[in-house]
Curated annotation (Swiss-Prot):
Record-stated family: Belongs to the TatA/E family.
Name of the protein: Sec-independent protein translocase protein TatA
Annotated compartments: Cell inner membrane
Main location: membrane
Gene3D superfamilies the record matches: 1.20.5.3310
Domain of life: Bacteria
Bilayer-crossing regions: 1-21
Entry membrane topology: Single-pass membrane protein
Positions of region (Disordered): 41-75
Amino acid sequence: MGGFSIWHWLIVLVIVLLVFGTKRLTSGAKDLGSAVKEFKKGMHDDDKPAGKLGDDSRTAEQAREAQAERDRDAR
């Protein structure tokens, strides 16, 4: 008596679809999926050893080296 049957959940789903519309629910589901994907990617990147950083860190390091060379040339 205390639990919901499948028919209760279907009625709730129909009401939610009527209130919010499918376009809003679809975009909300996409946003949620993207957030979960980014979270998993971030967790996976944390597991990498310090010596194996991503491409972003390499480009930042290269930019720092290039700036240091320009500073040395300017002197």
